[in-house]
Regions:
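Small-molecule-sensing regulatory modules
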Residues: 2-142
Length: 142
């Protein structure tokens, strides 16, 4: 948490041996990482924060903007968003709790990975329609 520039300065000044930050933030801010050794993690190696990388828009329901958003909204991404938010809620987590959650839909199946604050990791796959039950099962096995 905190200012990206401050973190990078502390890394350059030797206050950190290394840091893990979200690549999307650097892309969005236009910050070059050419002077750093960079390693991207896959979701099976390092479970990201829930809903990491999902762009959300909020507006008044029933407005013209609401209708435009419906047109560009990706249904699979929305299901992943809902799944990961359900995980946050079930764990009683917020932005200060180190919980990872990642879901992905392919061929009508959703795969879910959850990592709790102790580092324990659980995962599962099911039909998209059964995602709520899968989340309950995974949470109970943590």
């Amino acid at each position: 948490r905190g200012n990206v520039d401050t973190r990078l300065r502390k890394l350059s000044d030797g206050e950190y041996d290394g840091i893990i930050l979200c690549a999307a933030g650097f892309e969005r801010l236009g910050i070059s990482l050419a002077q750093y050794e960079v390693r991207e993690f896959e979701s099976h190696e390092f479970v990201p924060s829930p809903c990491q990388g999902i762009i959300a828009a909020e507006c008044a329901s029933g407005s013209s903007v609401s209708e435009m958003i419906k047109e560009i909204s990706d249904k699979e991404t929305m299901l992943c968003f809902k799944t990961e938010r359900e995980i946050i809620s079930a764990l009683g987590a917020d932005c200060t709790v180190p919980v990872g959650a990642y879901s992905e839909i392919s061929d009508g199946k959703i795969s879910v990975i959850i990592s709790d604050r102790t580092g324990k990791r659980v995962s599962g796959v099911c039909d998209v329609k059964d995602r709520a039950e899968l989340v309950k099962e995974l949470i109970s096995s943590l």
